[in-house]
């Protein structure tokens, strides 16, 4: 199966994927969001996950993602367990929804932050991979401001993702988001013209 109308959108934390997705949505493009699906799956499978990580991650029968994150981002084995549990479920859900969107014969986007980490085009047979790029120093600066995390926490989270420069080398198209919102809009427009 090849998803000929699907374009994978990826990037690291703090590169501007969310802003780019808002621009694409405002232009009428359909987006399949791996993170939203992951959040739904975390809730659906919260009891299984709590068996692994302890009932402290549940509050009134709702999984507290911050508490779970505090555990998994400090322990590579626990993060691997969670990813091994979730990623096949996310993929199944994404591909099912993508097959429906293929029927429209129009370009759409799969927002998969960990696209390369989970197997890239072997796991998600898309037509193109677009990277939203910002250099690592800018990622850190944005995360310090946006998420109010300590630099050590940011570095820990960045270490869990493939280096942004590696992703850049593996992508089919780069949207450089190291400047202004106005420039990002121009770059998105330039990319969209390649779809015509």
From Swiss-Prot:
One GO BP annotation of this record: coenzyme A biosynthetic process
Disulfides per UniProt: none
Keyword annotations: ATP-binding, Coenzyme A biosynthesis, Cytoplasm, Kinase, Nucleotide-binding, Transferase
Binding-site positions, ATP: 14-19
Domain called DPCK: residue spans: 6-196
EC number: 2.7.1.24
Transport as UniProt keyword: no
Predominant subcellular localization, coarse grouping: cytoplasm
Metabolic or biological pathway, per its Swiss-Prot or TrEMBL entry: Cofactor biosynthesis; coenzyme A biosynthesis; CoA from (R)-pantothenate: step 5/5
GO molecular function: ATP binding; dephospho-CoA kinase activity
One GO CC term on file: cytoplasm
Catalytic activity reported: 3'-dephospho-CoA + ATP = ADP + CoA + H(+)
Subcellular location: Cytoplasm
Primary role: Catalyzes the phosphorylation of the 3'-hydroxyl group of dephosphocoenzyme A to form coenzyme A.
Entries under HAMAP family matching the protein: Dephospho_CoA_kinase (MF_00376)
Family indicated by similarity: Belongs to the CoaE family.
The protein's name: Dephospho-CoA kinase
